[in-house]
């Protein structure tokens, strides 16, 4: 496991989760097979309010879902933060 650099992805606020999922957080929980217990941004212990859309820095535009608190989800799109690589779930 390793920490990686990620950023919030622009333009995803109105994006609906795939059929069969109540929310993006529900999508993450079902794909990971566990309940989200905290914001997964490094050094944040906030509650996981949403499944935030992030991209890996340097990887292009491939989207991932990460449990995040509202404050971390509202970071500017150009602000880089760290998360565990294993906590990211790809959006297909």
Where are these regions (language model features)?
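N-terminal soluble segments of membrane proteins
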Residues: 1, 38-43, 85-88
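Active-site or metal-binding loop neighborhoods of secreted/extracellular toxin and effector enzymes
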Residues: 4, 75-92
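Short cysteine-rich clusters marking metal-coordination/redox-active sites
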Residues: 36-42, 69-72
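Short, charged surface segments at domain edges that flank catalytic/cofactor-binding sites
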Residues: 4-35
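Flanking scaffold residues of small Cys/His-coordinated metal-binding clusters
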Residues: 34-39, 60-64
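Short beta-strand-alpha-helix junction that forms the catalytic/metal-binding core
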Residues: 59-76
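"Short basic amphipathic alpha-helical interaction patches in structured regions
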Residues: 54-57, 66, 81-88
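Histidine-centered nuclease catalytic patch
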Residues: 45-64
């Amino acid at each position: 496991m390793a920490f990686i650099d990620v950023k919030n992805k622009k333009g995803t606020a109105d994006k609906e989760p795939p059929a069969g999922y109540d929310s993006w957080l529900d999508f993450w929980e079902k794909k990971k097979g566990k309940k989200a217990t905290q914001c997964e941004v490094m050094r944040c212990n906030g509650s996981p309010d949403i499944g935030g859309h992030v991209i890996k820095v340097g990887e292009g535009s491939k989207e991932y879902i990460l449990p995040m608190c509202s404050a971390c989800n509202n970071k500017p799109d150009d602000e880089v933060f760290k998360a565990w690589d294993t906590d990211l779930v790809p959006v297909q």
